[in-house]
Amino acid sequence: MAKKQGAIEIEGTVVESLPNAMFKVELQNGHQVLAHISGKMRMHYIRILPDDRVVVELSPYDLTRGRIVYRYK
């Protein structure tokens, strides 16, 4: 998995599935962010459901939005 320069990776739990492959994710610290699925996960048809544990990559510029890069089994 390629790491993005300056991106913050944090674990969270999917709370709600939204339209257009967006998800509301509650992070370990209690904050909720809006996240979309990374392209590799979309390409390999990895499904994400509510209550899944995921790793979210946050940009240092906007900490309210992120990208889901991994789903725990």
Swiss-Prot record:
SMART domains: S1 (SM00316). Residues 1-73 form the S1-like domain. One of its GO terms (molecular function) is translation initiation factor activity. GO terms for cellular component: cytosol. It holds the Pfam family eIF-1a. Keywords: Cytoplasm, Initiation factor, Protein biosynthesis, RNA-binding, rRNA-binding. The keyword Protein biosynthesis applies. It is found in: Cytoplasm. The keyword Protein biosynthesis applies. InterPro entries: NA-bd_OB-fold, RNA-binding_domain_S1_IF1, S1_domain, TIF_IF1. Component of the 30S ribosomal translation pre-initiation complex which assembles on the 30S ribosome in the order IF-2 and IF-3, IF-1 and N-formylmethionyl-tRNA(fMet); mRNA recruitment can occur at any time during PIC assembly. Belongs to the IF-1 family. One of the essential components for the initiation of protein synthesis. Stabilizes the binding of IF-2 and IF-3 on the 30S subunit to which N-formylmethionyl-tRNA(fMet) subsequently binds. Helps modulate mRNA selection, yielding the 30S pre-initiation complex (PIC). Upon addition of the 50S ribosomal subunit IF-1, IF-2 and IF-3 are released leaving the mature 70S translation initiation complex. This is Translation initiation factor IF-1.
